Curated annotation (Swiss-Prot):
Organism expressing this protein natively: Ralstonia pickettii (strain 12J)
Transit peptide keyword on record: no
Disulfide bonds: none
SUPFAM superfamilies linked: Ribosome-binding factor A, RbfA (SSF89919)
GO cellular component, one term: cytosol
Family: Belongs to the RbfA family.
Compartment list: Cytoplasm
UniProt keywords, alphabetically: Cytoplasm, Ribosome biogenesis
Source organism, top-level taxon: Bacteria
UniProt protein name: Ribosome-binding factor A
GO molecular function, one term: ribosomal small subunit binding
Protein function: One of several proteins that assist in the late maturation steps of the functional core of the 30S ribosomal subunit. Associates with free 30S ribosomal subunits (but not with 30S subunits that are part of 70S ribosomes or polysomes). Required for efficient processing of 16S rRNA. May interact with the 5'-terminal helix region of 16S rRNA.
Gene Ontology biological process: maturation of SSU-rRNA
Length: 123
C-alpha cells in the first residue's frame, strides 16, 4: 500500500521538532562556554533524506558570529550525542545559522513607534 504524501512531511516535522528539543537540552548541559551567551533554538529544517539539518538560533549576551562559530565547531560532538538519543537510521549533519528575524522585528517595531511619536507630535 503506498504511503500518503503528507505522512513523509509529517514525519520530517516530528523529527525536526525532536532534534530541536534534544539539541536545546544538550547545548545547555554540554557546552560550557561563556563567550556563547544564552542560545535559543528557533527552528530546525531537515533535508528530505535527513542528511542535513539547518538549526536556526538567536543569542542573548554574545555576538551571533561568535555563538555560531562555537556551535558549528561543536556540531560533530552534538551530532554524536544526538545519535545516542534518537532512534532513527540517519542522524543529520548539523549546520547552525543565526536567525536575525527577531532583531529585524524589534527594529521594525522601534521604527513604527518612532513614526507614531513623530506623527503625534505634529498633530
Amino acid at each position: 500500500m503506498p504511503k500518503k504524501s503528507g505522512s513523509a512531511a509529517g514525519r520530517n516535522v516530528r523529527i525536526a521538532d525532536q532534534i530541536q528539543r534534544d539539541l536545546a537540552e544538550l547545548i545547555q548541559r554540554e557546552i560550557k562556554n561563556p563567550a556563547m551567551g544564552l542560545v535559543t533554538l528557533q527552528s530546525v529544517t531537515l533535508t528530505p533524506d535527513y542528511a542535513h539539518a539547518k538549526i536556526y538560533f538567536t543569542v542573548l549576551g554574545a555576538e551571533p558570529e561568535v555563538a555560531g562559530a562555537i556551535l558549528n565547531e561543536k556540531a560533530g560532538y552534538l551530532h554524536s550525542l544526538l545519535f545516542k538519543r534518537l532512534h532513527i537510521h540517519t542522524v543529520p549533519t548539523l549546520h547552525f545559522h543565526f536567525d536575525g528575524s527577531v532583531e529585524r522585528g524589534i527594529e521594525m517595531s522601534r521604527l513604527i513607534d518612532e513614526a507614531n511619536a513623530t506623527r503625534a507630535k505634529d498633530d
